[in-house]
Amino acid sequence: MALMILPFIGALSVSESLVAVVTVCLVYLIIKSFQDKIPEGLSRLPGPKPLPIIGNVLEVGSRPYLSLTEMGKRYGNVFQIQIGMRPVVVLSGNETVRQALIKQGDEFAGRPDLYSFRFISEGKSLAFSTDQAGVWRARRKLAYSALRSFSTLEGTTPEYSCVLEEHISKEAKYLIQQLDTVMKADGSFDPFRYIVVSVANVICGMCFGRRYDHHDQELLSLVNLSDEFGQVVGSGNPADFIPILQYLPNKTMKKFVSINDRFISFVQKIVSEHYATFNKDNIRDITDSLIDHCEDRKLDENANVQMSDEKVVGIVNDLFGAGFDTISTALSWSVMYLVAYPEIQEXLYQELKENVGLDRTPVLSDRNNLPLLESFILEIFRHSSFLPFTIPHCTTKDTSLNGYYIPKDTCVFINQWQINHDPELWKEPSSFNPDRFLSADGTEVNKVDGEKVMIFGMGKRRCIGEVIARNEVYLFLAILIQKLHFCNLPGEPLDMTPEYGLTMKHKRCQLRATARVRSDH
């Protein structure tokens, strides 16, 4: 975050800088003078002392999940920092976060009115918008219903239990063919490059009823846009935290707006095509389902929340964007961990060989018979914590947590990385050990421990696509492990250092994938 703000200030002229600094200082002093009074019986939030204008950005640094975890050791599970001029409450610890997001869920269910959020899906994003509770709940319910109904529809042939299973199985098989072609031509492959297109095709099938070739320029362009979006959002936008910067030239903000405009244009085009060919008696995909809802029921069951056509585009945009970025990141990390721990990769293959066999493709119903694979996925979620924070929350009223007063409209960061690496929850948290989730005899997954892993948020803002995401990661991975063996290039060490963003990616690299030969039987 500091890295985003400081270069921007340096780019201003001396006169511009002077005006900006004086103005911001005056506003800062005025705000400080009207600071909230603490109600009797409650305490003021602890935290590091902020500098004028930039707050605590220097202490937060370029890896906030680590620096805020360290601050939590000093100040506790509820503390306050200041980013620019905006106070931010940071929550850590499983019990504290559970108290805030579940037991006091309504009070922490808001989204902060950040300047950059207004440009995501033209301000109509389900995930980022500051819609009032009634509007947001109606849209969330609609999106969840559409996701669930289309993921559980019967497949086109008896071979598949549902549409989701069919899409994943077909794309996984196509991915294996692509990797075989690339390996023969180049001798190595970039895991993220090929996985992300396969995952994007699954969500394209669900949302739009179509798939794209792995070399389709339109889809590749969108994949790159999504990656850029995650980097910009994850880094923090200076204008979100120093309001005066909204009115000054800002290259980062200009790039951010351009990314969102191009993304929404792609979705608008497809939604328009769906409107033109819409047939109420032939609902083809999630987009058709949402259109049908708008045509039939402009109001929800309480007759007080209108669902506009524009917000349909926003919902589809959210489902599409989040649907491939999160899952492709999880799968790409999974392949990296397979390479980093070859003995675990072999044990996973043996589990598949014994419980599924090698003569058929794994299916969703095999999942309960593959406890090592399930624990491997849980440990990837925990150890990588590739979603280190949830999307920022916001308090909807004056409230308190752990005895500390938190005013209405306070921005709240949830440190998922800290929970997943908390030594009070996990033995040797820095070690990668899937066995931590297995029963003593290795035949069952400890569901209580599994639920402690935080990657999809919690409570009212929990990711609506979580069940689909978990199923997709499992089935893609099961098919890949059954058919391929992954390793790194000779003499090239594997770099598992994450690159910070909204979703933390591993560094781009080249790996090898070889088909499991007949002798493996």
Curated annotation (Swiss-Prot):
Entry membrane topology: Peripheral membrane protein
Gene: cyp1a1
CDD domains on file: CYP1A
PANTHER family the record matches: CYTOCHROME P450 1A, STEROID 17-ALPHA-HYDROXYLASE/17,20 LYASE
PROSITE patterns reported for this sequence: CYTOCHROME_P450
GO molecular function: heme binding; iron ion binding; steroid 17-alpha-monooxygenase activity
Protein name: Cytochrome P450 1A1
E.C. number(s) listed in UniProt: 1.14.14.1
Enzyme class name: oxidoreductase
Residues reported to bind substrate: F229
Superkingdom of the source species: Eukaryota
GO BP: hormone biosynthetic process; progesterone metabolic process
Entries under SUPFAM superfamilies matching the protein: Cytochrome P450 (SSF48264)
Substrates-to-products reaction catalysed: an organic molecule + reduced [NADPH--hemoprotein reductase] + O2 = an alcohol + oxidized [NADPH--hemoprotein reductase] + H2O + H(+)
Function (record text): Cytochromes P450 are a group of heme-thiolate monooxygenases. They oxidize a variety of structurally unrelated compounds, including steroids, fatty acids, and xenobiotics.
Family the entry assigns: Belongs to the cytochrome P450 family.
A Pfam family the protein falls into: p450
Organism: Chelon saliens
Sites where the protein binds heme: C463
Organism phylogeny: Eukaryota, Metazoa, Chordata, Craniata, Vertebrata
Listed GO CC annotations: endoplasmic reticulum membrane
Primary localisation category: endoplasmic reticulum
Entries under InterPro entries matching the protein: Cyt_P450, Cyt_P450_CS, Cyt_P450_E_grp-I, Cyt_P450_E_grp-I_CYP1, Cyt_P450_sf
